[in-house]
């Protein structure tokens, strides 16, 4: 399947800035990947002494393979990049557009455990405006990968800057990392905040302060 123009532009912009997720070219179809993942997951679970003949476990390798390819890591495949609606700003709207409390679930690329949080995204319209739900879909696409929060924040920013043809975009993410909460230090109360600011959100203190004040969760 040919990639959409939006997917091609966003991927090129991320590669140009060194912000693309480290990944190899695709050499198999989604169904082929599921078969291979299921096989290897069966071996892993067996090495952990789990009895895969038990009716509670026998479908677990298949379920994990499907979950990886179709759901939690679907953002590794630009064939899944959301259909984007960008229109000319004919009404001349020039005030901040902000979408907040965007639910976000990703996966830590170091331990493959959950990152759970909320995102706020804002932009100042110039020549183009974007369908509001498309912002949520872009956040979800990049979250559906093994990630680090810093890169995720920047990927969302660059994607929207590219599609909207403006630098005036801001992204803030607050998230709980289960690699901190459920293992290692086992801190159940801490969270991590990252911001990525472009254009006037970075250069103008008043605009930056307005965004950050309104983006408080």
UniProtKB/Swiss-Prot annotation:
Binding locations of Zn(2+): 108, 111, 179
Gene Ontology BP, a term: one-carbon metabolic process
Catalytic activity reported: GTP + H2O = 7,8-dihydroneopterin 3'-triphosphate + formate + H(+)
Cellular component, GO, one term: cytoplasm
GO molecular function, one term: zinc ion binding
EC number of this enzyme: 3.5.4.16
SUPFAM superfamilies: Tetrahydrobiopterin biosynthesis enzymes-like
The protein's annotated pathway: Cofactor biosynthesis; 7,8-dihydroneopterin triphosphate biosynthesis; 7,8-dihydroneopterin triphosphate from GTP: step 1/1
Pfam families per the UniProt record, alphabetical: GTP_cyclohydroI
UniProt keywords, alphabetically: GTP-binding, Hydrolase, Metal-binding, Nucleotide-binding, One-carbon metabolism, Zinc
Keyword presence, GTP-binding: yes
HAMAP family: FolE
Similarity comment: Belongs to the GTP cyclohydrolase I family.
Assembly and oligomerization: Toroid-shaped homodecamer, composed of two pentamers of five dimers.
UniProt protein name: GTP cyclohydrolase 1
Organism per entry: Shewanella denitrificans (strain OS217 / ATCC BAA-1090 / DSM 15013)
Origin organism lineage: Bacteria, Pseudomonadati, Pseudomonadota, Gammaproteobacteria, Alteromonadales
């Amino acid at each position: 399947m040919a990639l959409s123009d939006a997917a091609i532009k966003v991927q090129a912009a991320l590669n140009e800035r060194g912000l693309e997720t480290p990944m190899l070219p695709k050499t198999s179809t989604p169904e082929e990947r599921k078969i291979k993942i299921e096989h290897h997951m069966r071996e892993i679970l067996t090495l952990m002494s789990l009895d895969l003949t038990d009716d509670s476990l026998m479908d677990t390798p298949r379920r994990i393979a499907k979950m990886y390819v179709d759901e939690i890591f679907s953002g590794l495949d630009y064939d899944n990049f959301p259909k984007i609606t960008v229109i000319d700003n004919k009404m001349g709207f020039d005030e901040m557009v902000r979408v907040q409390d965007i639910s976000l679930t990703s996966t830590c690329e170091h331990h493959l455990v959950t990152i759970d949080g909320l995102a706020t995204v804002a932009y100042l319209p110039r020549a183009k405006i974007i369908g509001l739900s498309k912002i949520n879909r872009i956040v979800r696409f990049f979250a559906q990968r093994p990630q680090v929060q810093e890169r995720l924040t920047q990927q969302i920013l660059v994607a929207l800057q590219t599609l909207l043809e403006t630098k005036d975009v801001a992204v803030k993410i607050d998230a709980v990392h289960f690699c901190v909460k459920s293992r290692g230090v086992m801190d159940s109360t801490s969270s991590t905040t990252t911001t990525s600011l472009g254009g006037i959100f970075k250069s103008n203190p008043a605009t930056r302060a307005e965004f950050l004040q309104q983006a408080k969760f």
